[in-house]
Regions:
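Class I S-adenosyl-L-methionine-dependent methyltransferase catalytic core
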Residues: 1-191
Length: 191
């Protein structure tokens, strides 16, 4: 069994439990453009306890890139710790339109135009390159849970393999992919 030194995870956060106004769900309210119950059902979700119970064959010294939204920032930190990682910093993807303006779609309270990645470390693994990577990326919005290739390229520059993408929707060349939507074949690298 492969033991991974770098894990990228985009968990199926349980938005269904947040509920509309008046349901008592976490105190959050559905607002116009919030994730609809049908979109939540389309993508499925897992409870926080089920996410914490996942066992990942991880090296003693490893990196975790854990995607989250504003609504699950606290739970994401808890999840990283439950998997044996210590959160170190937050990387933010500012989703922009072609003209550079924010591409906000859904959200609780405010319309979200960002997605966050908690960078966490297990053991004492350092970055493999200098600290020239920014903590803010201004990249176009992509389909649900799809990350830009530039994100994976950055991960490969600063974190060692073997690589695992957990809850993958595509299979990147040179990476293992776990998830009920992960294709069986890896995408060939583009020249």
């Amino acid at each position: 069994m492969t033991v991974y030194r770098t894990i990228v995870a985009d968990p199926p956060w349980p938005y269904a439990g947040m509920g509309p106004v008046g349901t008592g769900g976490r105190g959050a309210a559905y607002v116009r453009n919030s994730p609809s119950p049908s979109s939540v059902a389309r993508y499925g979700s897992m409870s926080i306890d089920d996410l914490k119970a996942i066992e990942i064959p991880t090296a003693k010294d490893a990196h975790l890139y854990l995607s989250t939204t504003n609504a699950f920032m606290v739970e994401a930190h808890e999840l990283a710790r439950s998997w044996g990682f210590v959160p170190k910093t937050i990387l933010t993807w500012g989703k922009v339109k072609d003209d550079g303006s924010p591409s906000s779609k859904t959200g609780y309270y405010f319309r979200g135009a960002t997605e966050h990645v908690i960078f966490a470390v297990r053991g004492s693994l350092r970055l493999t390159s200098d600290h020239a990577e920014p903590t803010l990326w201004l990249w176009p919005r992509l389909p649900h849970s799809v990350k830009p290739d530039r994100f994976y390229e950055m991960v490969e520059r600063v974190s060692p393999g073997p690589y695992l993408e957990l809850f993958a929707r595509r299979r990147r060349y040179g990476w293992d992919a776990w998830g009920n939507e992960a294709p069986t074949e890896a995408e060939e690298p583009t020249p």
